[in-house]
Swiss-Prot record:
The gene is atpG. This is ATP synthase gamma chain. SUPFAM superfamilies: ATP synthase (F1-ATPase), gamma subunit. It is found in: Cell membrane. Its main location: membrane. Belongs to the ATPase gamma chain family. Coiled coil: none annotated. GO terms for biological process: proton motive force-driven plasma membrane ATP synthesis. Disulfide bonds: none annotated. PANTHER family: ATP SYNTHASE GAMMA CHAIN (PTHR11693), ATP SYNTHASE SUBUNIT GAMMA, MITOCHONDRIAL (PTHR11693:SF22). It is a peripheral membrane protein. GO terms for cellular component: plasma membrane; proton-transporting ATP synthase complex.
Length: 314
C-alpha cells in the first residue's frame, strides 16, 4: 500500500509540472497571437490599397494585346510574364506549415487538404514542385518522395517583409526559369481563436481569380480602398506604374498568407495548450482523489490492525 501511495504521489507531482509547462506555453501563444493580430490589421489596410491599384491596372493590361510572354533572355520577370497564362507542365505548391509541433491539428489539416487538392487537380510526384515554408511540410513531402525544390525554415513569430521578399524573389525566379508554370499557396486561414479554415490561392500567373480571392480576403479593409478609376491620368504610364506596383502586390499576397497562417498557428497552439492544461488539471483532481482514498484505506487498515491486536491481548 505504501508503494502505491508513493506511485500516485509521483504521478501527481509529474502532472503538476506538465500543467505548469502547458499553462506557460498557452500564455506565450496567446501573447504572440495578440501581437500578430495588431500587425494583421495594419497589413489589411496596406494590402487593400495595393490590391485596388493593381487590380484596376492589371485587369486592363490582361485585356490588352500587350499581355504577351516576356523575353526569355531577360534575367528579371516582367509584368507580362506575371500576367500571361502558359501551358502547364509543372505545378508549384507553396505549402505553409509550422516548424514545430504542439499546434493541435494545424499541420495535419494543411497537409491533408493539400493532398486532397493534388488528387482533385491531378497533381502528383511527376508534375509537382513543392516550395515549403515551415519544416513540418518540408520533412513531410521529402519523406513522401515529392520534389521539394525550395524550403524556408524559421519564420518569425511575427513575419517581416524582409523574410517575404526573400521567398518571393526565389519563387518568381523559379517561375521565370520555368521550374513550374503555375503556383498555388496553401495555408490555414485564421477565423477566430477557436477555429481556422484551409485556403488554396492561385498566386502565379496573376489572374482575375487572384484578384477576386484577394478582394475577398480584404473585405474588412474595404473602407480604405483606393478608387483608381478611368478618370485618373497615369504618369509616366500604366505599364511603368504596374511594373513598380505588381511586385509589391506579389509580396503582399505571400506576406498576407504567411501572416494569416502564423496567426492561425498561434491560435491553434494556444487552444491546444489550453486543452492540455485543462486535461492535466482534471487528471490532477482524479489523482488527488485516488491518493486520498488510498491514504484513507491505509489509515483504516492500520487502525483495524491495532484494534485487532488490542482485542487479542485481552
Amino acid at each position: 500500500m505504501a508503494e502505491s501511495l508513493m506511485d500516485v504521489k509521483r504521478r501527481i507531482d509529474s502532472t503538476k509540472k506538465t500543467h505548469q509547462i502547458t499553462s506557460a506555453m498557452q500564455m506565450v501563444s496567446t501573447s504572440k497571437l495578440n501581437q500578430i493580430q495588431k500587425h494583421t490589421s495594419t497589413y489589411q489596410v496596406y494590402a487593400s490599397k495595393v490590391e485596388s491599384i493593381v487590380s484596376h491596372l492589371a485587369k486592363a493590361h490582361l485585356m490588352s494585346a500587350s499581355a504577351g510572354v516576356a523575353n526569355s533572355n531577360s534575367n528579371t520577370i516582367s509584368v507580362s510574364e506575371l500576367l500571361a497564362q502558359r501551358p502547364v507542365k509543372k505545378t508549384g505548391l507553396l505549402v505553409i506549415t509550422s516548424d514545430r509541433g504542439l499546434v493541435g491539428s494545424y499541420n495535419s489539416n494543411v497537409l491533408k487538404q493539400t493532398n486532397d487538392f493534388m488528387r482533385t487537380h491531378k497533381v502528383d510526384a511527376d508534375n509537382a514542385v513543392v516550395l515549403a515554408v515551415g519544416g513540418t511540410g518540408a520533412d513531410f513531402y521529402k519523406k513522401n518522395g515529392l520534389n521539394v525544390a525550395y524550403e524556408y525554415r524559421g519564420v518569425s513569430d511575427v513575419p517581416t517583409f524582409k523574410e517575404v521578399r526573400e521567398i518571393v524573389k526565389t519563387v518568381t525566379s523559379m517561375y521565370h526559369n520555368e521550374v513550374f508554370d503555375e503556383l498555388y499557396v496553401f495555408y490555414n486561414h485564421f477565423i477566430n481563436r477557436l477555429s481556422s479554415g484551409f485556403r488554396a490561392v492561385k498566386m502565379l500567373p496573376i489572374s482575375e481569380e487572384t484578384f477576386e480571392q484577394s478582394e475577398s480576403d480584404n473585405r474588412k479593409a474595404k473602407d480604405s480602398r483606393v478608387d483608381v478609376g478611368p478618370e485618373y491620368e497615369m504618369e509616366p504610364s500604366e505599364e511603368a506604374i504596374l511594373s513598380a506596383v505588381l511586385p509589391q502586390y506579389a509580396e503582399s499576397l505571400v506576406y498576407g498568407a504567411i501572416l494569416d497562417a502564423k496567426t492561425a498557428e498561434h491560435a491553434s497552439s494556444s487552444t491546444a495548450m489550453k486543452a492540455a492544461s485543462d486535461n492535466a488539471g482534471d487528471l490532477i483532481d482524479k489523482l488527488n482523489l485516488k491518493y486520498n482514498r488510498a491514504r484513507q484505506a491505509a489509515i483504516t487498515t492500520e487502525i483495524t490492525e491495532i484494534t485487532g491486536g488490542l482485542v487479542a491481548q485481552e
